[in-house]
């Protein structure tokens, strides 16, 4: 059976520099793990308890595409108190920063577009426009 090949735009993507660094540093006690932006602390007990309660209650199904309405409302309230008023309808919850960046870029960038990126920047960000068929110029 012939394996499918990735589109040329995907095959040309640079490997994740963050993953390269993580692979070298993982498991070493003399290295501080700053590569993925995750805490070195265990997830707080109230969050773990809420996750366990949701699992026990069978709350394990897909949610609305834009995120749970209660979560979107809470984020809107928080942002409104912190900065300026924002409606819950303007909030979209994603599963990661990369997903959010990909969705936002898909809304703005298409094949043949040229994206100018002010560097330094998170290395993975430079690859998103390339996936969409755009060229990237770093300045």
Please identify what each model-predicted range represents.
Residues 5, 15-17, 124:
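Intrinsically disordered, low-complexity sequence elements enriched in Ser/Thr/Gly/Pro
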Residues 4, 57, 138-139:
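Short, local alpha-helical segments
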Residues 11-96, 103:
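N-terminal small-domain helix-loop-helix segment of the aminotransferase-like
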């Amino acid at each position: 059976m012939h394996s499918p090949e990735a589109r040329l735009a995907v095959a040309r993507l640079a490997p994740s520099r963050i993953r390269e660094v993580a692979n070298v540093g993982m498991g070493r006690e003399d290295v501080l793990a700053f590569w993925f932006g995750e805490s070195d602390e265990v997830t707080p007990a109230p969050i773990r308890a809420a996750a366990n309660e949701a699992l026990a209650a069978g709350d394990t199904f897909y949610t609305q595409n834009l995120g749970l309405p209660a979560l979107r409302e809470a984020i809107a309230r928080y942002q409104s108190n912190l900065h300026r008023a924002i409606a819950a309808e303007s909030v979209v919850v994603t599963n990661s920063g990369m997903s959010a960046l990909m969705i936002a870029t898909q809304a703005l960038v298409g094949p043949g577009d040229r994206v100018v990126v002010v560097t330094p920047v998170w290395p993975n960000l430079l690859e998103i426009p390339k996936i969409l068929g755009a060229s990237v110029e770093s300045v």
